[in-house]
Amino acid sequence: SSPKAFNGVYLPYWTYDAQTTSNFTGNAGYDRKVRKRDGTLETRTTWRPVSGVHQEFMDDITVMPSNRQENSGVKLCEPFKLSKLIPYDPKVLAGFVAERYSIGLKDGWAIAQTTIHEKLKSSIEDYIKFHWKCNHASGVVFSTVYSKITYKYILVPVWISSFKYKEKTYQFAVNGQTGKVGGKAPVSAWRVLLAILFFVGVIAALYYLT
């Protein structure tokens, strides 16, 4: 089965910036080699408690406030080139659907904080390994204070389509900036996949020509 017609859509995103200050505790792990009785070497890790303050600026944390497109492959075709955004111009949207957000600014910020928390956890673990010159970091617990919080409401270009294979409908999306494809495909549906790649190629060609 071939894909249905592609629909050009401008989808809404919230982006958030914030300065973060996190007080943390954790454990720094130091590896050492110990020779066993049979002559082989074994790695053992010694742990010591650590604590500190980590500061980091979070830039352009994106939240897609569109419930309608959450299963269409849009998340899988991220990221978008946010540095290429231009000021709002109705002429650019002419001929395309521009979807309105369904998740408000406040709820979007709550979602963004979940993303920020995961990024901070990884950053703090890296900070511990660098600052204490250890091999591992574990048991990180932290609390974060946010300041200088700003946001933007943006629209990003996406091509949406779907195809039917063995009585099941599969949706997918194409990033209108990069041509990256997102979505799930059935196993062994080679003709369908080739058709998708053909249409993606056409879109990419149009993008580069314009």
Task: Identify the residue ranges that each predicted region occupies.
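Charged, low-complexity helical/coil segments in non-catalytic cytosolic or luminal regions
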Residues: 1-164
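An acidic- and aromatic-residue-enriched active-site/binding cleft used to recognize and process polar
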Residues: 21, 177, 186
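Flexible loop/turn segments at secondary-structure boundaries
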Residues: 23-25, 168-169, 180, 189-190
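Extended, hydrophilic extramembrane loops/domains of integral membrane proteins
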Residues: 156-182
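Juxtamembrane/start-of-transmembrane alpha-helix segments at the extracytoplasmic/lumenal side
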Residues: 184-195
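Juxtamembrane boundary at the C-terminal end of a transmembrane helix
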Residues: 204-210
